UniProtKB/Swiss-Prot annotation:
Key word Nucleotide-binding present: yes
Gene: DCK
UniProt-listed PANTHER family: DEOXYCYTIDINE KINASE, DEOXYNUCLEOSIDE KINASE
GO molecular function, one term: deoxyadenosine kinase activity
Record organism: Bos taurus
Family membership: Belongs to the DCK/DGK family.
Designated name of the protein: Deoxycytidine kinase
Known EC number: 2.7.1.74, 2.7.1.76, 2.7.1.113
Amino acid sequence: MATPPKRSCPSPAASSEGTRIKKISIEGNIAAGKSTFVNILKQVCEDWEVVPEPVARWCNVQSTQDEFEELTTSQKSGGNVLQMMYEKPERWSFTFQSYACLSRIRAQLAALNGKLKDAEKPVLFFERSVYSDRYIFASNLYESDCMNETEWTIYQDWHDWMNNQFGQSLELDGIIYLRATPEKCLNRIYLRGRNEEQGIPLEYLEKLHYKHESWLLHRTLKTNFDYLQEVPILTLDVNEDFKDKHDSLIEKVKDFLSTL
């Protein structure tokens, strides 16, 4: 099916702040469907832009399709840090989580200074946020004894400092939670065939699912960022394949944006 051209997409919600960019994070478990979902969103409207997760950086592969990516010193030095983390989590979890968050901040800040500056009603969708970096993935690795106490303390201190420097620019206006069962995510991991992920056990996905549910569904997960407790959340059930349900999903997103 041919992809329709982007069209002008005035926001249904008038904003007294003019062209302030609305920032929405797309959250969910590994292989819940985030990449597919953001690819749908970026085709909808010329005032909508997405910042994909910088997996290419983590795998040391330069992606020519991603305007937010460029070859970095860490990439030039070699090393697939995503694969290294999955193969030896006790050795590489701290390194990976620190680099994952750094590369995410860099990509998201670059997007804020990109073409949306001239958009009439700009919306920027992040594929995950600095908050899920810390409170879902890094904390799970610490609780699984893949980070020791010293590493976890340093990571939290570093994360707090980075957010003090840049966090105000990345504060979210809303979150879209793509909710899928761990079993469905495991099946999708096999189907998409990313080499680094093929050894992920169901238990790992179950732990991540529990954390996502605590944070985004039950809202019982505590963070150091009080404003997150009040950030609006749209939960979408994505257990079924949604490639043929674009229109329904887009309407739900538009309705959600109209409330922000």
